[in-house]
Regions:
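Terminal-proximal interaction/regulatory segments of ATP-powered molecular machines
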Residues: 7-130, 137-178
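A short helix-loop-helix "switch/interaction" segment in the helical subdomain of ASCE P-loop NTPases
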Residues: 1-7
Length: 178
């Protein structure tokens, strides 16, 4: 089922959906559709992911046999959507670093900075400097976990914004920004 959606085989995915509907296994349908939507389609078509969640909700509300219709719509949408695993790859990369290292959150990002000069504290009212602040610990400051997949117009726009943001020099010297 999931592999059929990942492989963009609409007919196979609908066939396997039919098998699960015949078994009246809405829990498995829901779990598998949600996992596939977020894992395989993801940022390739986030609107399709949202529509999938809505379709599952509608199917659960109306029950079978009518619930098959929104589920079929979701499957067709997911099968024919551009695919992107960039979000999964990004969190996996971050968690891999986390498993092998342990770096402290910078003091200025902590909820209540103790014994910190006011000019060294994070300024919640200065949205003009937020993208200039270094948020990763010093040892990871140049680490890039997210790498866009250019399979969809949506993720291409994200990639363009990311490129602009990565050109901005980030600093942990907050006093210099004020």
């Amino acid at each position: 089922f999931q592999k059929s959606i990942r492989g963009s085989d609409v007919d196979a995915a609908l066939y396997y959906l039919g098998i699960m509907i015949e078994a009246n296994d809405m829990d498995s349908i829901e779990r598998r559709l949600l996992v596939t939507a977020y894992e395989d389609i993801g940022l390739g078509n986030p609107a399709a992911v949202a529509r999938c969640v809505q379709a599952i909700d509608a199917a659960k509300r109306v029950g079978f046999p009518e619930g098959r219709i929104p589920l079929a719509m979701a499957i067709i949408d997911l099968c024919l959507s551009p695919k992107s695993k960039s979000a999964e790859s990004a969190i996996d990369a971050a968690m891999s670093v986390l498993r092998h290292t342990s770096y402290k959150v910078p003091d200025y990002l902590r909820f209540t900075p103790v014994n910190m000069k006011e000019e060294d504290q994070y300024d919640y009212n200065r949205s003009d400097i937020w993208n200039q602040i270094q948020y990763l610990p010093d040892a990871l400051k140049d680490t890039q976990f997210y790498h866009p997949q250019m399979n969809s117009s949506y993720e291409k726009v994200l990639a363009q914004n990311l490129e602009k943001l990565r050109k901005v020099k980030r600093t942990s010297n907050l006093a210099a920004l004020k």
